[in-house]
Amino acid sequence: TNPEWVIDTNVLISAALSARGAPGRLVQLVLERSALVFSQPTFDELKTRLYRPKFDPYISLELREAVLHDLSAAARWVEIGEPSRYCRDRNDDMFIETALAAQVGVLVSGDQDLLQAPAIPGLRILNPQQALAEALA
């Protein structure tokens, strides 16, 4: 198993909304057994997206604050500069840059742009189901 993981915003939000699916189970395992890695831009994106009104019916403001606090407190933080260009969607590049800066071997994403990014030496990009299987192995 990997000691540290970079997990993208959509997977973290899925985990916050439901503990039962692969994202929720994966995040739980990572918090219990290893560590999550953030850079300021990746955390800022999570914060911005988690507070979107469309999630109001599913998660209270108090729970959102608790999730952000707990993830932030449990994470290892890395500095990144202006990300290089890896993906079709420039917003995804910061996750790759964070993973490279932290020297983690795995980035978890459900985003097709990331999953189909050109190969990057030393980094595997897995979907939540693949990552969960690996975390449980």
Locations of regions flagged by a protein language model:
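PIN-domain endoribonuclease scaffold, especially VapC-family toxins
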Residues: Q28-E82
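Residues at secondary-structure transition points
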Residues: G21, V37, I59-E62, Y86-N91, ...
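Residues that scaffold the ATP/ADP-binding catalytic core of kinase and kinase-like folds
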Residues: A15-A16, R49, Y58, A117, ...
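Acidic, PIN/NYN-like endoribonuclease modules and their adjacent C-terminal/linker elements
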Residues: L100-V106, Q112-A137
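Active-site neighborhoods of divalent-metal-dependent phosphate/nucleic-acid chemistry enzymes
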Residues: S72-V106, Q112
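A secondary-structure boundary/capping signal
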Residues: D8-T9, S39, G110-D111, P128
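Short, flexible loop segments at the rims of nucleotide/cofactor-binding pockets, characterized by
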Residues: I13-A15, F55-P57, E82-R88
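Short, well-structured N-terminal submotif of metal-dependent ribonuclease cores
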Residues: T1-F38
